[in-house]
Amino acid sequence: MIRKVKKEIRVIGFDDGTFKFKARGDKVILVGVVMKGSLDVIGVVTRWITIDGLDVTDAIIDAVTSSRFKDLRVILLKGITYAGFNIVDVERVYKETGLPIIVVIRKKPDITSMELALKKHFNDYEMRIRLLKSAGTPIELIPGKLYYQAIGISREKAEEVIRITSRNALIPEALRLAHMIASAVMTGESTRE
């Protein structure tokens, strides 16, 4: 439980790399950037996850629990779908790491369209839809520009964490850097957040 959000709060932000869809089963890098507030990068963790697979939850749990970074206070996710429709089980990550999760989203997700795509392309669509819905309804923080979902943390504290960990962009710096690093690994060059 976070009593007070300090300026130097330790967070880890996860994002995957840009990828060209070739075939289900290919791998994409997942990068976690560990930061103290919005200024100091403390470290980086990586895992490989499967396009349209079901391994991102295990990858995040392993990256957090097996790392040397034992003073983390919050996990930041850039959405809950990675490598296509590899969907994070946010409730399981919260339970197994003991850390609150803040999912940050730039565009409000169209859940109906996502459900239709899942039904069309996946035999296990019911389970994937359940995972999508388990994060709750996105809350609008900056009208039309930034939304979030909070698991294991109050709305007020989640918004404070987002503000404190953001620097020159709308999203927390750990997420911005994770995106740049992951994209550079996958394509040879970083892409814009």
From Swiss-Prot:
It comes from the Archaea. InterPro entries: Endo_dU. Belongs to the UPF0215 family. This is UPF0215 protein PYRAB00790.
